[in-house]
Amino acid sequence: MEDLPQGYRPNVGVCLINSDDQIFVASRLNVPGAWQMPQGGIEDGEEPKSAAIRELREETGIVSAEIIAEVDKWLTYDFPPAVKAKVNRLWGGEWHGQAQKWFLMRLTKDEGEINLATGEADPEFAEWKWANPEEVIEQAVDYKRPTYAEVVTTFMPYFQGNAISAKCKSTKW
C-alpha cells in the first residue's frame, strides 16, 4: 500500500454520520467505557475502501451507507506498552501501532439495520450511540484521541451543519 508507514499495522476507520451529523460510536466489550468508531485491519490484497465497507458491515451490520470523503494520508497512533504486547500476541506481529485510512460515510437508511452481533465476526461492541464530534474525541481512549481529533477536523466541512448534542440511542445486543 502506497506510503504505508513502516512498523504500523494497516487499518481502516469509518466515521459514520446520520442525518443529524451525529457520529456513530460503540463501546468495546473488552474495554468498558471506551467508545470508538468502527475500525479494523486491511486484509492482504484488499483495498482500503473495500476494507472500510467490510469492517462497517462486520462490526455494525450496516450496509446502507455512502462514502462521502476520505482522509488523503495514513493517520497513525502508537499502542501503549500493555496494549502493544497484547495485540502483537493476538495478531502475530511486531507493530508499533496502527496506520489508518479514514472514510467519512453517511447512513442512507434507517438505523434499524444496526446489529452489533451480525454473526459475521465475533462481536466487539456492547452498545452503540450517536454522539456529537466533541463527545467522540472525549470518550475515546487516550492514545486514539489525537487521531480522532484529526479525523473530525478533516471531515467537519462535509457535515451539513446539523450537529446537535448527543442523542443517546444505546442498544445492547
Predicted regions and their residues:
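Charged phosphate-binding loop/patch that engages nucleotide di/tri-phosphates or the phosphate backbone
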Residues: 133-173
